[in-house]
Amino acid sequence: ELDYSENITIENVTFFGGGFNIRNSENITLKNCDFHYPSTNKFVLEEFQWFAQGNSGENKMSSFFNGKDNKIINCEFAYSNAPIYFGGDNVLVENCDFHNIEWDMNSNGGSGSVMIGGAGIFRYNTIFLSGNSEGLRLTETNATAEYNHLFDMGNLQHDGAGINVGTRSHYGTRLSHNWVHDCNR
C-alpha cells in the first residue's frame, strides 16, 4: 500500500497472493511485474462487502486511486477475483496481460475486468477469460484505448461489452484499432 507517495519504480517482481492499493500518488511505475491471485473475497471470514475502488473495508481490489502520471508497463495480472482499477489522471497501462478475472462476481454492475481513469492511455494490452460484464471500462473523460486484444469475456453476467465507455465518460475519449472477438455478449 502506498499513499501520497512520489517517484517510485517497482520492477521485475512477482507477487503471489498480494495486490496493490496505491492512492493519491504520482509517478509510480510498475514494470515487468507479475500479479498472481492479487485479490479474492473474504466470505469465509464473514466479510461480505463487494469489491469497489473506494472500498474502505477488508474486501479491496487492486487499485490506483486518484494520483497522476502513473505507469504500468509489461505486467501480468492473473487470477484476480476482483476488477483492477487504474484511476487518477494520465495513467499509462501498456503491453500488459489481464486474464482469469472475476470468477464469483463480487463487484458492482458497472465494473469491467480492467477500469481506466481520466486521460488514461490503455494500449497494446490483452484481456481474456473474465466473468464480469465488461472487459475494459473507461470510467472518466479523455481516455484512450488503442491496439488492444480482448476475447472470451462476460462469461458470468447477462449484459456488457468488450469495451464500455460510460455515458458520462465519452467526452474526449478515443477508441482505435482494438480487436474484440469471441465474447459471450
Which residue stretches match the model-derived regions?
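Intrinsic structural disorder
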Residues: 1, 62-63, 72, 114
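Right-handed parallel beta-helix
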Residues: 6-17, 26-39, 49-50, 66-81, ...
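Structural detector of coil-to-beta-strand junctions
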Residues: 19-21, 41-42, 61, 83-85, ...
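Intrinsically disordered, low-complexity Ser/Thr- and acidic-rich flexible linkers and loops
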Residues: 43-61
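Residue-level detector of functional hotspots within protein domains
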Residues: 56-63, 136, 149
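Aromatic- and carboxylate-enriched substrate-binding clefts and catalytic-loop regions
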Residues: 117, 139-140, 162
